[in-house]
Amino acid sequence: TTQGCNCSIYPGHITGHRMAWDMMMNWSPTTALVVAQLLRIPQAILDMIAGAHWGVLAGIAYFSMVGNWAKVLAVLLLFAGVDAETHVTGGIAAKTTASLTGLFNLGAKQNIQLINTNGSWHINRTALNCNDSLNTGW
């Protein structure tokens, strides 16, 4: 089955196989994010054990001795990333100044042009009758 589309990224007819292939090609950032998070696990466990409070270490030791590994995992997850606070001299003034000057930032900007070509209206040269399932942003 083919589908007619007047998009700038898919001129002419496009098969479902081509659309599926393009969607699979967009998985690579997600896969990279998942792998990066998985690779953090050993270091996170080491940090939790090496830099833990004595009470957390006692809880891990007790629950591991009685064989309750679910509670060991719960203790590790509950106290992951718990660190002491750091007070920076002048930090509040710096944050206030940064938020005040942030009001004058231009922010995100996209030039949008409405173009009439041969009686057909386009936004940035992408046809308005394009099938939205192709995720062109329009």
Curated annotation (Swiss-Prot):
Pfam families assigned: HCV_env, HCV_NS1
UniProt-recorded name of the protein: Genome polyprotein
Glycosylated residue positions: N6, N118, N124, N131
Region annotation (HVR1) ranges: 85-111
Segments on the Lumenal side according to the record's topology features: 1-59, 81-138
Feature type site, description Cleavage: A84, E85
Note: Viral particle assembly takes place at the surface of ER-derived membranes in close proximity to lipid droplets. NS2 associates with E1/E2 glycoproteins, NS3 and NS5A, which interacts with the viral RNA and core protein to promote genome encapsidation. The nucleocapsid buds at the ER membrane where E1/E2 glycoproteins are anchored and afterward associate with nascent lipid droplet to acquire APOE and APOC. Secretion of viral particles is probably regulated by viroporin p7.
CC terms in the record's Gene Ontology section: host cell endoplasmic reticulum membrane; host cell lipid droplet; membrane; viral envelope; virion membrane
InterPro entries assigned: HCV_Env, HCV_NS1
Family from the record: Belongs to the hepacivirus polyprotein family.
Sorted UniProt keywords: Clathrin-mediated endocytosis of virus by host, Fusion of virus membrane with host endosomal membrane, Fusion of virus membrane with host membrane, Glycoprotein, Host endoplasmic reticulum, Host lipid droplet, Host membrane, Host-virus interaction, Membrane, Transmembrane, Transmembrane helix, Viral attachment to host cell, Viral envelope protein, Viral penetration into host cytoplasm, Virion, Virus endocytosis by host, Virus entry into host cell
Biological processes, Gene Ontology terms: clathrin-dependent endocytosis of virus by host cell; fusion of virus membrane with host endosome membrane; virion attachment to host cell
TM helices/strands, residue ranges: 60-80
